[in-house]
């Protein structure tokens, strides 16, 4: 769903420049989906793990036939890139709010993986940012776009089921293995812990989003 519709920043003959933050999970799947549109170009990738970054850059080149122009460990450099129109936020959940707001402040539209934020407060901040900076922000709730879900909801709302008295909901939690807890060890080669632990000026990034 769209939080706020903003104005397009590219001309009729231009491609939409996309940058991905967080390349090792759903974010890259989102990027591949975007790249199916011939009017989209991947401008930059960002990940704190250099190994992941290089692997995804190679995969993207294989898909598009072009080298990715910019590779960043620090996601803030991707946000600052003037050639990027749209930012895909595919990082772990606790990063979504800061990165989405920063992208909006930089005048970029955003596709953010679910969940939107870690709290209602974060979500409210993100909605206000989309409104304040007049940006298009879509959350990866893909089920809302699938016709069979829309048809089912339309059928329920039509009243053909009569008065609904009971709703049962289940959540299948066992499909993904849990992340193992590992003992302290040396920083893996290629991982930038300084970016991973960046929090000191996070409040400044959200300043002014009333």
Regions found by a protein language model. Name each.
Residues 1-112, 121-136:
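N-terminal glycine-/serine-/threonine-rich beta1-alpha1-beta2 phosphate-ribose binding loop
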Residues 195-205:
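Conserved small/polar residues in nucleotide/adenosyl-binding loops
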Residues 91-92, 115, 202-203:
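Proline-centered helix-kink/hinge sites
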Residues 106, 187, 200:
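Active-site-proximal cap/lid insertion segments
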